[in-house]
């Protein structure tokens, strides 16, 4: 018995040292193939943060290792990937996802497996409200918050004929629900004269824009983004949709969606987004400079 105790005592420092050398693995899953314009800059920011954490000593004296997987923008694939990260890679927790429906699927997985999930991008409020669970947390303002940011300005303009256009999936449906509800509370006199819900990533921009033109709105609420937004803006400019209608668009101020518009960028829109060149706090200046130095590019 005594030799065994002595051996354990002798080996203890080496066991502790070996444990300290083992990195803490965390799992990240996202729709890199589906939305590279948004998620490649995101990935660069994630890698920069990981490098900074490890350079400063890691977490609890251990390096941080991020195991990255692509979820193909599909709820079923995302759950399969999440299971692989937890069961095979033995990560401490998982984070990421882009689409709201994918985020909800992974949140349900986290609940069933009782593993921490930090949703990086999904905006649907259901993620932490209606369908929330104690294992799921979010990084970004939800759809309710994003919409509420614009409602006061929308109400103050005094426009009464509103048209709606939003992608036909969880995020778009949630945005429409909250905008109509919040605006109607502040302005009971508004009417919604047209509503278009194109499939995500497959907008028939000509037909959608013409339907809105025919409805003669004096204001438009949109939650389109990415290529759907580009096509909508192009057709809207061509058909004069924005000439007599003020536009409120969630996320159109995100550089990933704003920059590709180039000379077609409309003026006077009310948007939410990330004005990376205008935020002048010490923390953001440090981040912006570090990102530029590491990647020779601006953050977005």
Give names to the regions the model predicted.
Residues 44-66, 184-190:
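Signal peptide-proximal N-terminal region
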Residues 85, 89-98, 118-120, 163-166, ...:
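Periplasmic-binding protein-like
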Residues 235-300:
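Extracellular/periplasmic periplasmic-binding protein-like sensory domains
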Residues 23, 38-44, 58-127, 139, ...:
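Beta-alpha junction/loop-to-helix N-cap segments that form part of ligand/metal-binding clefts
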Residues 18-22:
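Boundary at the C-terminal end of the N-terminal hydrophobic targeting segment
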Residues 4-16:
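Bacterial N-terminal signal peptides
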